[in-house]
Amino acid sequence: MKQTILARRYAKAVFSIGADSGKYGEYNDALQAVANLYMTNPDVVDALTNPLYPLELREKVMVGIVKSMDIDAVMSNFLNLLVEKKRAEILPEIAEEFQAMVDDAQNLSHGSVISAVELSEELQGKIQQTLEKLTGKKVELTTSVDPSIIGGIVAKVGDLVLDGSIKTQLAGLKESIKGRE
């Protein structure tokens, strides 16, 4: 079950400490690394969140992770607090919320472009510039190819979706023809 509100609160607390000390980038790297460990190793999740294991054992596991990743004292205390408060299961959500806060602080958005064919570097650059003008933020794009859109592109940045695909245009034309019958 997603606990976004709680994750956002934890992320906001750590972000404010990181922003005050100028280490939010370092904290973000640490959180992303631990969240990645969660995603790739289910045994770690079990060792940190399973209530059948004594709290002392779960804390030792987190201490081991912190030492192996050479994480600074503040972040180490935060990660240990999550284990102590039985909130370690929301660590990936906290990392996601923290990343969003870092992106916002750096005036950065992540976007995606789907096209029917592979786009040239030049065209990707033009699309990126256009999206940056529309959003007022620096945009990091990921591109993918989906032949089912027939032609054109679908660009997404945050809540903004620009669908210029032939597939969507044909669907709109079909609906307008149906409406006249």
Swiss-Prot record:
GO terms for molecular function: proton-transporting ATP synthase activity, rotational mechanism. The keyword Transcription does not apply. It holds the Pfam family OSCP. Its main location: membrane. InterPro entries: ATP_synth_OSCP/delta_N_sf (IPR026015), ATPase_OSCP/dsu (IPR000711). Keywords: ATP synthesis, Cell inner membrane, Cell membrane, CF(1), Hydrogen ion transport, Ion transport, Membrane, Transport. Coiled coil: none annotated. Belongs to the ATPase delta chain family. This is ATP synthase subunit delta. It comes from Desulfotalea psychrophila (strain LSv54 / DSM 12343). The gene is atpH.
